């Protein structure tokens, strides 16, 4: 994954940040598990929940490797309901 993250630094035009709305109210442990799972996907450089708005996630990814629907699929694959809001 470090190589993918360095690619984003090397090619910033490939970096896209999106907002995803998570329907469930997730506890701290489940949020951490979801972030770890997403950051383990090749092409995703970072994932985080917005402080005080725990239903919103900011996810950075390499658009040469993934598209927004694939990122959303990665979220939903972790047994949560979510919708793509759009780019930041």
Language-model segment annotations:
Residues 12, 47, 78-88:
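Conserved short beta-strand edge segments in small beta-sheet-based binding/regulatory domains
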Residues 55-60:
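A generic structural motif
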